[in-house]
UniProtKB/Swiss-Prot annotation:
Keyword Protease found: no
NCBIfam families membership: hisG, HisG_C-term
Cofactor: Mg(2+)
A Gene Ontology cellular-component term: cytoplasm
GO biological process: L-histidine biosynthetic process
Pathway: Amino-acid biosynthesis; L-histidine biosynthesis; L-histidine from 5-phospho-alpha-D-ribose 1-diphosphate: step 1/9
Pfam families: HisG (PF01634), HisG_C (PF08029)
Protein name stated in the entry: ATP phosphoribosyltransferase
EC number: 2.4.2.17
Top-level EC class as recorded in UniProt: transferase
Length: 282
């Protein structure tokens, strides 16, 4: 099985890190410019340009791919199925115009010129809003085009908006909200190995916002402890040899840990230990 991941850029390291955390450790010594073996002899990682990964999967060069939704949509490939939002690389594809222009809405671009690295998404967007524009594909420095009279506006990726502000561009509309996705072809989405990879990556994401709590509690306080814990399916309770205390374990949301610990102490729990969870298969 072959997994296509970005070979460089802001998505490269997070993609590799996610695979490592999921247990698909990359084997040292492989030609990491093109591909890498993993500890699973049936799984190989292929490195490709983020924009090319949808085609790799669609053409059968890879079984699954990891890249941004913006790249999948721009590829305009019909037989790709999204398996999972991998929850990183979040950004927006926006329509923007110079701050000093009179453009306030998308309709002000009628018969105008738009520069973008995403011509297919851009044309579909303007078709949807029924505005006639001339779309020019560029391969970089999109933000400069309105200032050198190449375009009246741009459609480009932004994460924080800083680059747009630096180039005196204002957002007119949001075209697409994007993040990194795991996807496959329709005919391989139900493949057992594909499902295993999907489950492994999902287990990392599920664990990210959870914490594992362990504590001791008097038996007569158990009901109160259970009431406090917002755990998954109730806590695990075990006897402690030679003690009248019980060991209570539970998985809780990370954002609830602070208040939960305080409440647990109030009802008699002690020796509370909080640990991170590497993976959680729900």
């Amino acid at each position: 099985m072959r997994i296509a991941v970005p070979n460089k850029g802001r998505l490269h390291e997070p993609s590799e890190e996610l695979l490592e955390r999921a247990g698909l450790h990359l084997v040292d010594g492989a030609d990491r410019q093109l591909h890498a073996d993993t500890v699973d002899p049936d799984v190989t990682v292929l490195y490709a340009r983020a924009a090319d990964i949808p085609e790799y999967v669609a053409d059968g060069a890879a079984d699954v791919g990891i890249t941004g939704l913006d790249q999948v949509r721009e590829s305009d490939t019909d037989d790709l199925v999204e398996l999972r939002d991998l929850d990183f690389g979040r950004c927006r594809l926006v329509l923007a115009a110079p701050e000093e222009s009179d453009i306030e809405t998308v309709y002000d671009f009628e018969d105008g010129r738009i520069a973008t690295e995403f011509p297919k998404i851009t044309r579909r967007y303007f078709d949807r809003v029924d505005v006639d524009v001339d779309v020019t594909e560029v391969s970089g420095a999109t933000e400069l085009t309105p200032h050198v009279d190449i375009a009246d506006g741009i459609v480009d990726i932004t994460s924080t908006g800083t680059t747009l502000r630096m180039n005196r561009l204002a957002v007119v509309d949001e075209v697409l909200e994007s993040s990194v996705r795991l996807f496959a072809r329709e005919d391989t989405a139900d493949n057992e190995k594909v499902k295993q990879v999907d489950t492994a990556l999902g287990s990392v994401l599920a664990a990210d916002d959870k914490r594992y709590l362990m504590m001791n509690a008097p038996e007569d306080a158990l009901d109160d402890v259970k009431d406090v814990l917002p755990g998954m399916g109730g806590p695990t309770v075990m006897d402690i040899a030679g003690s009248d205390q019980l060991a209570v374990h539970a998985v809780v949301e990370e954002r609830a840990v602070f208040e939960t610990i305080s409440s647990l102490k109030d009802v008699g729990a002690s020796d509370i230990l909080v640990t991170e969870i590497e993976r959680l298969v729900e």
